[in-house]
Amino acid sequence: MSSHFPLTFRISPLIRITLISLYFSLTLPLPFLADITSASVPPLMLWTGIVMGFIVLVGALSERVIVDEDTIKVTYPSWIPSFFRKGWSLPWSKIKDLKSRTTGQGGLVYYFVSLDAQTAFLLPMRIAGFSRLVNIVTEKTGIDTTDIRPLSQPWMYLVLLVLTSFLMIVDGWTIATAIGMGR
């Protein structure tokens, strides 16, 4: 397999679009409803929270996996504080194994285990080009990755995106009704 390094893998666009759409469909009606119900939380505070939450969500979805001849690393843009999301870097030569762990929902995630066995690093599984990344892991480490599959399949996010679209239709009706009642 011929690769031109460094390579950068980002979170899948389908996942980003779905999660951002879900966020807005769940939050946008709130300031309008707060206004017409005279809620104790003012609409301006809700708008501020929505914008701040959006910034946090975009930050979390801006993860990048960068691979080169010597290293795999997970990074985030410099505007994301390191206490919020910390990246990591691991030389290929220091990777001993990939260990699977069952999630609370019954899925499998994989961790790179370093040679010192003191640290483990989560294999990013929601990136576009996941199979290419897994092939590079095999090429660089010699670890058998034939059984490794993405944590969630694209159809799951497509279903969530379709359901979110229906929710947005209801949101539109809710917002229009709230604006109409406010007049």
Task: List the predicted regions and their residue ranges.
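N-terminal membrane-targeting/pre-transmembrane regions
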Residues: M1-S38, Q118-A120, R132-M168
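Hydrophobic membrane-targeting signal helices
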Residues: L28-F32, L57, D171-I175
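Short, aromatic-rich membrane-interface segments at the entry and exit
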Residues: S38-L46
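Conserved beta-hairpin
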Residues: I50-P91
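Surface loops and adjacent helix of pleckstrin homology
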Residues: D70, P77-W79, S100-T103, M125-R126
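Structured surface patches comprising rigid loops and adjacent beta-strands/short helices at the edges
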Residues: S93-L98
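Canonical phosphoinositide-binding patch of PH/PH-like domains
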Residues: T102, G106-I136
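Juxtamembrane boundary at the C-terminal end of a transmembrane helix
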Residues: M168-R183
